[in-house]
UniProtKB/Swiss-Prot annotation:
Biased composition (Basic and acidic residues): 356-365
Provenance organism: Danio rerio
UniProt GO MF annotations: DNA binding; double-stranded RNA binding
Protein name (database record): Interleukin enhancer-binding factor 2 homolog
GO annotations of cellular component type: nucleolus; nucleus
Keywords per UniProt: Activator, DNA-binding, Nucleus, Transcription, Transcription regulation
Subcellular location(s) per record: Nucleus
C-alpha cells in the first residue's frame, strides 16, 4: 500500500516511541440503548397506551413504601441517636472517644427505604484510631444516654464488624464506624477495624452526597425502590448491589439527550432493556462510578458468571414485559421467579428463558500444574547445559 512507504524498520509506528508490541488498548463498547438515539428510529405507529402499566407501578411502589408508623419510629430513633452523638462532639466531657462528625447515609438518607426493613444507617467518623474497645465504648455510651433520657423505651445495643447497631421494638439504626482519612495509614489489623470496612463507610458518605446532589428526583427514588423489589424476587438479579441499583435507576431516568426525567413506565422498561443489552457484561462501558477516581466501572465488582446471570435474567423479563406480563414481573400476582427458568405463555406467545452464555474454564488439577512446572524446570536446565 502507498501509505506503507517510508516507514522503515519497526512497522507502522516505528521502533521508537510506538505502541508496545502485543499491547491492545481496552476500548469498551457501548450497548444499544434506544432512548439515547431515539431520533434515528422515528415511530411508524403511535405508542401503545400504558396507563394500566403506570398505575400498577405506582400501586407497587405504594405497597413497598414504609408505613407512616414505620417512618415515625425510625425518624424518632435516628433523631435521638443523632442528638446524643452531636452532644458528644460538642461537649465530650470525660469521654475519650473523640468524634469528628456524624452523617446520615444509605436508603434512609436517600428516601428509598422499603416496607418491612425499618433500618437506617449513620456513619460516625472518629478522630482517633478505631479500636474495637473504642467502638464498644461509644455504643455503650450512646445507649446508656438514651436509656437515661427515656427509661420506658426498651433498647438493645450490639457491636459488629462494621460498628454497632441500636434497636428499639420496631426500628434499628446501624452506626458504621470510620476514621479521618490520615488515620487509614496507621491501622493495625489486630487492634483496629478492618480497613475495607472503614473505606466502605467513607464511600457511603460520598454516595449519599452524590445522590442528594444528582438523584433526588422523585421518579428516580420510586424506580430504585421498584428495582430493589425485583432484585429480591428474581435470584438472577441478586448480584446487583444497592449502589449499582442507585446508579442504574438514575441513569434510566435522566441519562438521555433531553436531560428531562423520563416517565416511570418508560424508565422501568429501559432498566430491563439496558441490562438485557449487556450494560453490565465484560467489555461494556457500563456505568462509571461518579464517586471514585480512575473510571471505575461499577459492574466489575461482579464475577463474570454473575454479570452473565444478570443479563440473561433481564433478557427473559424484557420478553415477558413486551407481551404484557408486567403484573407478574411486579409481584402483583404472586411468586414469579419461575419465569426465568421455565417457559411461559402470554396471549399465545411462548417465552423461553434465555440460557447462560458463560461457562467456567475447567480447573487444572494440582498434579497437572506440578507436572507442568517440572516440565518447565527441566526445559530450563537443558537450555542451561546447552549454553
Amino acid at each position: 500500500m502507498r501509505g506503507d512507504r517510508g516507514r522503515g524498520r519497526g512497522g507502522r509506528f516505528g521502533s521508537r516511541g510506538g505502541l508496545v508490541q502485543g499491547y491492545r488498548p481496552f476500548v469498551p463498547h457501548i450497548p444499544f440503548d434506544f432512548y439515547v438515539c431515539e431520533m434515528a428510529f422515528p415511530r411508524v405507529k403511535p405508542a401503545s397506551d400504558e396507563t394500566a402499566f403506570s398505575e400498577c407501578l405506582l400501586k407497587r411502589n405504594q405497597d413497598l413504601s414504609p408505613t407512616p408508623s414505620e417512618q415515625a419510629s425510625i425518624l424518632s430513633l435516628v433523631t435521638k441517636i443523632n442528638n446524643v452523638i452531636d452532644n458528644l462532639i460538642v461537649a465530650p466531657g470525660n469521654f475519650e472517644v473523640q468524634i469528628e462528625e456524624v452523617r446520615q447515609v444509605g436508603s434512609y438518607k436517600k428516601g428509598t427505604m422499603t416496607a418491612g426493613h425499618n433500618v437506617a444507617d449513620l456513619v460516625v467518623i472518629l478522630k482517633i484510631l478505631p479500636t474495637l474497645e473504642a467502638v464498644a465504648a461509644l455504643g455503650n455510651k450512646v445507649v446508656e444516654t438514651l436509656r437515661t433520657q427515656d427509661p420506658s423505651e426498651v433498647l438493645s445495643m450490639l457491636t459488629n464488624e462494621t460498628g454497632f447497631e441500636i434497636s428499639s421494638a420496631d426500628a434499628t439504626v446501624k452506626i458504621l464506624i470510620t476514621t479521618v482519612p490520615p488515620n487509614l495509614r496507621k491501622l493495625d489489623p489486630e487492634l483496629h477495624l478492618d480497613i475495607k470496612v472503614l473505606q466502605s463507610a467513607l464511600a457511603a458518605i460520598r454516595h449519599a452526597r452524590w445522590f442528594e446532589e444528582n438523584a433526588s428526583q422523585s421518579t428516580v427514588k420510586v424506580l430504585i425502590r421498584l428495582l430493589k423489589d425485583i432484585r429480591v424476587r428474581f435470584p438472577g438479579f441478586e448480584p446487583l448491589t444497592p449502589w449499582i441499583l442507585d446508579l442504574l435507576g438514575h441513569s434510566a431516568v435522566m441519562n438521555h439527550p433531553s436531560r428531562q426525567p423520563l416517565p416511570l413506565n418508560v424508565a422501568y422498561r429501559r432498566c430491563l432493556q439496558m441490562l438485557a443489552a449487556g450494560l453490565f457484561l465484560p467489555g461494556s462501558v457500563g456505568i462509571t462510578d461518579p464517586c471514585e477516581s480512575g473510571n471505575f466501572r461499577v459492574h466489575t465488582v461482579m464475577t463474570l458468571e454473575q454479570q452473565d446471570m444478570v443479563c440473561f435474567t433481564a433478557q427473559t423479563l424484557v420478553r415477558v414485559l413486551s407481551h404484557g406480563g408486567y403484573r407478574k414481573i411486579l409481584g402483583l400476582e404472586g411468586d414469579a421467579s419461575y419465569l426465568t427458568t421455565e417457559m411461559s405463555t402470554w396471549d399465545g406467545v411462548i417465552v423461553t428463558p434465555s440460557e447462560k452464555a458463560y461457562e467456567k474454564p475447567p480447573e487444572r488439577k494440582e498434579e497437572e500444574d506440578e507436572a507442568l512446572e517440572e516440565g518447565v524446570e527441566a526445559e530450563d536446565e537443558s537450555m542451561e547445559t546447552q549454553e
